[in-house]
């Protein structure tokens, strides 16, 4: 289901990112996407069989006193409402907590993206708060609100 993103995935991921429903949330596709546009991000391509369905990514805060990971995901709209998002997120969260040693995972999501919010809550995330005018609506000068969401492993080892 998840595989580290490589150059062979670029064409398929770029095609998904250029779909209007995805571009509305993620903005225009950078020339270097997905291999060089965010050097601090680690990315995994989501597959259903042999078909590219989307991508998850994370960035890490390595400072021991603030260690956490921030994640993001997009799916080809053809794969929405099939449980694929929560499954991919669960696999990524297991990797981050079990293999990478994180106890906290955060994300931000457009406040009007009810479908994504449901998927995140199904995965165990909770809303921390609403961030007002936290980013621009891609391709416009309008501001959008986002929820900050987190998942914290309990109980924490002291």
Annotated model-derived regions:
Residues 106-109, 126-143, 148:
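Conserved catalytic-core motifs of GNAT/GCN5-like acyltransferases
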Residues 81-95, 117-122:
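Conserved acetyl-CoA-binding loop-helix of GNAT-fold acetyltransferases
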Residues 5, 75, 109:
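Hydrophobic adenine-recognition pocket in adenosine-nucleotide-binding enzymes
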Residues 1-35, 146, 155-158:
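A short, well-structured alpha-helix characteristic of acyl/acetyltransferase catalytic modules
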Residues 21-80, 95, 152-156:
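Acetyl-CoA-dependent GNAT
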Residues 12, 70, 87, 104, ...:
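Amphipathic alpha-helical recognition patches that constitute DNA-binding helices
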Residues 85, 89, 113-116, 133-138:
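Short glycine/proline-centered loop/turn elements that form peptide/ligand docking sites
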């Amino acid at each position: 289901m998840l595989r580290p993103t490589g150059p062979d995935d670029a064409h398929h991921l770029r095609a998904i990112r250029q779909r209007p429903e995805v571009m509305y949330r993620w903005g225009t596709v950078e020339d270097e996407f997905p291999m060089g546009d965010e050097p601090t991000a680690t990315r995994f391509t989501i597959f259903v069989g042999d078909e590219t369905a989307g991508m998850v990514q994370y960035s890490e805060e390595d400072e021991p006193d603030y260690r956490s990971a921030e994640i993001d995901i997009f799916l080809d709209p053809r794969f929405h409402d099939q449980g694929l998002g929560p499954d991919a997120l669960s696999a990524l969260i297991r990797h981050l907590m079990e293999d990478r040693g994180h106890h906290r995972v955060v994300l931000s999501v457009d406040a009007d993206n009810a479908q994504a919010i449901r998927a995140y809550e199904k995965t165990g995330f909770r809303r921390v708060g609403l961030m007002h005018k936290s980013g621009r609506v891609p391709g416009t000068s309008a501001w959008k609100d986002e929820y900050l969401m987190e998942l914290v492993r309990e109980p924490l080892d002291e």
